[in-house]
A protein has these predicted regions:
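Conserved catalytic motifs of ABC-family nucleotide-binding domains
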Residues: 167
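Catalytic Walker B motif of ABC-type/P-loop ATPase nucleotide-binding domains
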Residues: 171-174
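Conserved ABC nucleotide-binding domain
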Residues: 134-148
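Helix-to-loop junction immediately C-terminal to a conserved catalytic motif
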Residues: 61
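ABC ATPase NBD coupling module
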Residues: 78-95
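Short coil-to-helix segment of the ABC ATPase nucleotide-binding domain corresponding to the Q-loop/switch region
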Residues: 107-115
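Conserved ABC ATPase signature
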Residues: 146-150, 154-156
Length: 236
């Protein structure tokens, strides 16, 4: 796929979160959160339900406006962007994988993946060519059967391909293995954490599964509204 868009020079972070603060109904979910992830690097964020993990991803995506702080993706602060500019920036520089894939079941895998590129303005022939290449690389049968007939692992691989089709600077994954059996979880986990090295983007995985989190280059825990380092293998 080549060099990802949004690279800002050697060593520059693809994602930089600075002093992020968010509270709702007098409850502090994020209090001065900092996070930097560089191209080719992975970070996992763990924490109990309700700790603010998905809120953090929402702030990175620009779906939630923090009380204060900055979220720089590919060198630009999404917090201060107007809606239309934010949507363009998100489409160009961010890819997302959710727990249940969020794919259209009636479309084939190649149609699902190409659709994301078409919505981003890629010409049809290029969109389908890139979609087929990605799905082939990720081991997904892309012709014939609709996506709804694929196995859980194949659907998640299709979701990863869709997230990568626009060559994002940052790939975000929210509980991407939560609905999978153990064997399929391990396969999808291996695929996900291979993405930064193969495609050159930054990867942030939010998960409650410590075995998944341990595969990341860095593991952090969101606790008491703060993001703190966590040692690999620590289950306490």
């Amino acid at each position: 796929m080549g060099q990802v868009k949004g690279e800002t020079g050697a060593g520059a972070p693809a994602l930089k979160v600075s002093g992020l603060r968010y509270e709702v109904a007098d409850r502090m979910l994020l209090d001065g959160v900092d996070l930097q992830v560089r191209a080719g690097e992975s970070a996992a964020v763990v924490g109990p339900s309700g700790s603010g993990k998905s809120t953090l991803l929402g702030c990175v995506l620009g779906l939630i406006r923090p009380t204060q702080g900055k979220v720089e993706v590919a060198g630009q602060d999404v917090v201060r962007m107007r809606q239309r500019a934010l949507e363009r920036h998100r489409s160009r520089y961010m890819g997302v994988v959710f727990q249940f894939g969020e794919l259209l079941p009636e479309l084939t895998p190649v149609e699902n993946v190409a659709l994301a590129a078409l919505l981003g303005g890629t010409p049809s022939d290029q969109a389908y060519e890139r979609a087929e290449t990605l799905l082939r690389d990720l081991g997904v049968p892309y012709e014939g059967a609709p996506t709804g007939q694929l196995s859980g692992g194949e659907r998640q691989r299709t979701a990863v391909a869709r997230a990568l089709i626009n060559q994002p600077a940052v790939l975000l994954a929210d509980e991407p293995t939560g609905a999978l059996d153990r064997a399929t979880r391990d396969s999808v986990t291996e695929l996900l954490f291979d993405v930064p090295k193969r495609w050159g983007c930054a990867l942030v995985v939010v998960t409650h599964d410590f075995e998944v989190a341990d595969r990341a280059d860095r593991c952090l825990e969101l606790t008491a509204a703060a993001l703190v380092p966590r040692k690999a293998g620590d289950r306490s």
